[in-house]
């Protein structure tokens, strides 16, 4: 008897599973708010130097650039007891008295003057948030294996609520960055535990549906954020609004049961059996639950217990040529996806369109993108879908270099298309990665791959700083990396309709067999090629 059969006996998709998925899905709505929050809390409005004391703003104070616009970071020098310069050729100086912002929104940029020479700090704040997600993935995965999925999930809800709320009261930028790091750290634990607890409590045939449903919760969260930001123009209140609900989620998480597999592997089989019986009662199958025994439960997870005893490390991902190829190609694809995705997702204000409307469009494109990805995965295969998604995204980003800034509609269309392709790339990678790595090292492979996505998302904001050298440099970097990631994906083996490999040897045999099957039709075609024989009265046929 397998664990899936035990799950069928207690109700594989009953009221419990619907409640379970709902409890896991609702907090994901708020994760989109935190991931993309700096789009609105760190908006840079138009600004110019504050005039010196006893002087009013005007062309005699503020120089004009080549485009006829007021300089944002310079003003004319005013010598004591001298007349003000009346042309743009006078000596200039930085904004010594601060800036005037043409906006009613209150952001971290306007509060701490993150403009001109300090504009790099804005991108650094987002990178530090992404660094928190990266470190959280490295640390919390191990803690989850030691202490269980549910305690980590509950603690991360509390940490996100506390650190997010504390961010709203940050007196200085460094303290703001520390709390944002903790927000990212906790988000990583929420993502990890949500994925595992969803997969382990629903039947195999329903996993794709429930995973997609939880994924769409993130998409819906992207619709909610612009509405909240529009209604709450003060960044501190907006930060507090998206953080406080996690105090409630931490209380609701007590209704989420622990992973049965983890309980059995941790030697807590009796507790696992009690939980299964409660689930059976909730699903209206109390009698079936009472019939379950510890022996049946342990027997159903015997394979998991055996695999848990085997010791595998990150080094095993590079043990064989096939695993090395898979690990390196997937790492590049994950890095490219995270790197390019956040270049577009966090660059909403660069396209000259209302940021609230554009964010809704950016969120909305995920719906058709994920649907098209599912169809492509089912009919065209994994490596074609993955390669095409990244290559098309890279082409769209590179195309932005050749579109003038005043053609905002065309630039927006290209950005939305690229963002949709990258959303599809993420959806494909989660499935593709889990299918490529053998069972004995799948969790390690998924973890390393996810780390590369986080590294990409952490570096992505910093690349925008290169735009100070030449405006087109960031898009060249983003687009080229996406093209490289897509090209790497084309070197991965196809997994469509293939059984999942259990061991490293299974993976080697499977790859060699698939390679052999590809060569057989080619050999057969070659054998069927009959050379043309000359014919005619003067031909010797002996």
Swiss-Prot record:
Annotated protein name in UniProt: Organic anion transporter 3
- An example Gene Ontology biological process: monoatomic ion transport
- Name the glycosylated positions: 86
State if Transmembrane is listed as a keyword: yes
Q: Where is the composition biased (Basic and acidic residues)?
A: 518-527
Per the record, ranges on the Cytoplasmic side are 1-9, 145-150, 198-212, 258-327, 376-389, 433-471
Does this entry carry the keyword Aminoacyl-tRNA synthetase? no
Catalytic reactions of this protein: estrone 3-sulfate(out) + glutarate(in) = estrone 3-sulfate(in) + glutarate(out); estrone 3-sulfate(in) + 2-oxoglutarate(out) = estrone 3-sulfate(out) + 2-oxoglutarate(in); glutarate(in) + 2-oxoglutarate(out) = glutarate(out) + 2-oxoglutarate(in); urate(in) + 2-oxoglutarate(out) = urate(out) + 2-oxoglutarate(in)
Encoding gene (name):
SLC22A8
Phosphoserine modification sites are 4
Q: Where is this region: Disordered?
A: 518-542
Task: Identify the InterPro entries for this entry.
Answer: MFS_dom, MFS_sugar_transport-like, MFS_trans_sf, Orgcat_transp/SVOP
Any GO CC annotation of this UniProt entry:
basolateral plasma membrane
Tell me which family the UniProt entry assigns to this protein: Belongs to the major facilitator (TC 2.A.1) superfamily. Organic cation transporter (TC 2.A.1.19) family.
Q: Could you list the residue ranges that cross the membrane?
A: 10-30, 124-144, 151-171, 177-197, 213-233, 237-257, 328-348, 355-375, 390-410, 412-432, 472-492
Function summary? Functions as an organic anion/dicarboxylate exchanger that couples organic anion uptake indirectly to the sodium gradient. Transports organic anions such as estrone 3-sulfate (E1S) and urate in exchange for dicarboxylates such as glutarate or ketoglutarate (2-oxoglutarate). Plays an important role in the excretion of endogenous and exogenous organic anions, especially from the kidney and the brain. E1S transport is pH- and chloride-dependent and may also involve E1S/cGMP exchange.
* Places the protein is found: Basolateral cell membrane
């Amino acid at each position: 008897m397998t664990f899936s059969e035990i799950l069928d006996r207690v109700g594989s998709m009953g009221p419990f599973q619907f409640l379970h998925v709902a409890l896991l899905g609702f907090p994901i709505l708020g994760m989109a708010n935190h991931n993309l929050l700096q789009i609105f809390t760190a908006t840079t409005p138009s600004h110019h130097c504050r005039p010196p004391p006893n002087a009013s703003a005007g062309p005699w104070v503020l120089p004009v650039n080549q485009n006829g616009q007021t300089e944002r970071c310079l003003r004319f020098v005013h010598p004591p007891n001298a007349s003000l310069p009346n042309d743009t050729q006078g000596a200039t100086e930085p904004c010594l008295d601060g800036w005037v912002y043409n906006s009613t929104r209150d952001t971290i940029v306007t509060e701490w003057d993150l403009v001109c020479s300090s504009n790099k700090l804005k991108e650094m704040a987002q990178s530090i948030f992404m660094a928190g997600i990266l470190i959280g993935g490295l640390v919390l995965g191990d803690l989850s294996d030691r202490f269980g999925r549910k305690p980590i999930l509950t603690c991360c809800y509390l940490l996100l609520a506390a650190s997010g709320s504390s961010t709203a009261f940050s007196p200085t930028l460094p303290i703001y960055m520390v709390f944002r790091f903790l927000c990212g750290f906790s988000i990583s634990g929420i993502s990890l535990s949500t994925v595992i607890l969803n997969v382990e409590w629903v039947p195999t045939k329903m996993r794709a549906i429930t995973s997609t449903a939880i994924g769409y919760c993130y998409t819906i969260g992207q619709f909610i954020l612009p509405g909240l930001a529009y209604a709450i123009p003060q960044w501190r209140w907006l930060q507090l609004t998206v953080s406080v609900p996690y105090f409630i989620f931490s209380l609701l998480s007590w209704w989420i049961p622990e992973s049965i597999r983890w309980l059995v592997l941790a030697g807590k089989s009796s507790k696992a059996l009690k939980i299964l019986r409660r689930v059976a009662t909730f699903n209206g199958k109390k009698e079936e639950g009472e019939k379950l025994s510890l022996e049946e439960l342990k027997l159903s997870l015997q394979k998991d217990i055996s695999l848990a005893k085997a010791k595998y490390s990150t080094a095993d991902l590079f043990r064989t040529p096939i695993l090395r190829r898979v690990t390196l190609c997937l790492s590049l694809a994950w890095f490219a996806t995270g790197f390019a995705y956040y270049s577009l997702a966090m660059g909403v204000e660069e396209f000259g369109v209302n940021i609230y409307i554009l964010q809704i469009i950016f969120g909305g494109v995920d719906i058709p993108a994920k649907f098209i990805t599912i169809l492509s995965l089912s009919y065209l295969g994994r490596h074609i879908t993955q390669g095409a998604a990244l290559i098309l995204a890279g082409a769209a980003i590179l195309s932005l270099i050749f579109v003038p800034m005043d053609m905002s509609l065309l630039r927006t269309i290209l950005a939305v298309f690229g963002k949709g392709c990258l959303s599809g790339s993420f959806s494909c990678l989660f499935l593709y990665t889990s299918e490529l790595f053998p069972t004995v090292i799948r969790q390690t492979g998924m973890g390393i791959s996810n780390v590369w996505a986080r590294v990409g998302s952490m570096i992505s904001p910093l690349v925008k700083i290169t735009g100070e050298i030449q405006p087109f440099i960031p898009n060249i970097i983003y687009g080229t990396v996406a093209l490289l990631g897509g090209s790497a994906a084309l070197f991965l083996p196809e997994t469509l309709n293939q059984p999942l490999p259990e061991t490293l040897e299974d993976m080697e045999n499977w790859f060699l067999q698939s390679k052999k099957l590809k060569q057989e039709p080619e050999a057969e075609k070659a054998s069927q090629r009959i050379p043309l024989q000359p014919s005619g009265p003067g031909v010797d046929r002996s």
